[in-house]
Design a protein with these regions (language model features):
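N-terminal alpha/beta PP-like core and its mobile active-site loop of ThDP/TPP-dependent enzymes
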Residues: 1-288
Length: 288
């Protein structure tokens, strides 16, 4: 059955269907339709930040913690520019974040509209700007484009880094035709698959078999990819198989817990890390 609803309804419905339960945003004239649509979705908590950088940092932290895809929304002009620092950090750390950036109505591109960032007629080019701090950046040109561009953006973000969709206000308000829906305002088949997405887990047993041949204690240094892929259970399985102790890099310090009396967790590596890590590596504190 064919139905029609607004582009913003499609966006929040799709996000809810893949398990996203928070949207971090600063409201504004050219993003208010999306924010209002999120407010009326019981599955989504729309968090109102005081500054766009704060909203971007919240989305980044949400993703780093393993809660799911971090989503941030901001209006056009200066509001969108305030996202750049936060998205730059997400890009540097390869953190999955989806940024939904409002734009003035496309019909006014290059005609002196307030906060025009279309790149037309000498205006600031948001596409060029956000392409520098993202792994994927597209401007939604027609309402029907959202059906393909939104899953593409989410897939690109999940591969590691921020993805940006530029949303002109008239496109946000326009109606989009969709097929049979799953109750979340999005095509059932596509979202059902996306909702089950999870990075493939590796088998720890071949690694364990190799390391059992070594002499002495075994220490594992867990990197930030463990946190990004939520591979905490696999890390613990490997640690238990080896009887090893675990240290972490700073961006993965939550994956193994705090150092305790059982000695299973050594702490964080680096010059600002824990003494136990350096001592386990046979070096001086701050040297590992």
């Amino acid at each position: 059955m064919l139905g029609r609803h607004r582009v913003v309804d499609h966006i929040v419905g799709h996000l809810a269907a893949i398990g996203t339960d928070h949207l971090f945003a600063v409201d504004g004239a050219n993003i208010e339709d999306l924010y209002d649509a999120a407010h009326f979705r019981p599955e989504l908590t729309a968090v109102l930040a005081k500054h766009e950088f704060s909203a971007a940092a919240m989305a980044d932290g949400y993703s780093r913690s393993g809660a799911g895809l971090g989503v941030v929304a901001a209006t056009s002009g200066g509001g969108s520019l305030n996202l750049v620092a936060g998205l730059g950090e997400s890009l540097a750390s390869r953190v999955p974040v989806l940024a939904l950036v409002g734009q003035p109505a496309a019909a006014l591109d290059g005609r002196g509209s307030f906060q025009d960032t279309s790149g037309a007629n000498g205006s600031l080019d948001a596409g060029a700007l956000f392409s520098a701090v993202s792994v994927f950046c597209r401007r939604v040109q027609t309402p029907d484009d959202i059906v393909s561009l939104l899953p593409q953006a989410i897939s690109a973000a999940r591969a590691g880094g921020p993805a940006v969709l530029l949303l002109p206000k008239d496109i946000q308000q326009a109606r989009v035709g969709v097929g049979e829906r799953n109750g979340h305002g999005a095509p059932g088949g596509r979202v059902a698959i996306a909702a089950q997405w999870r990075p493939p887990a590796g088998d720890p047993h071949p690694i364990a078999a190799q390391l059992r041949r070594v002499t002495g204690e075994i220490a594992i240094i867990a990197g930030e990819q463990v946190a990004r892929d939520d591979a905490r259970a696999e890390l613990e399985e490997l640690r238990a198989l080896l009887g090893a102790r675990v240290a972490t890099v700073p961006d993965a310090k939550d994956v193994a817990g705090a150092p305790g009396p059982d000695g299973r967790t050594l702490g964080v590596t680096g010059v600002m890390g824990h003494r136990n890590v350096a001592e386990a590596g046979g070096g001086r504190p701050g040297g590992l």
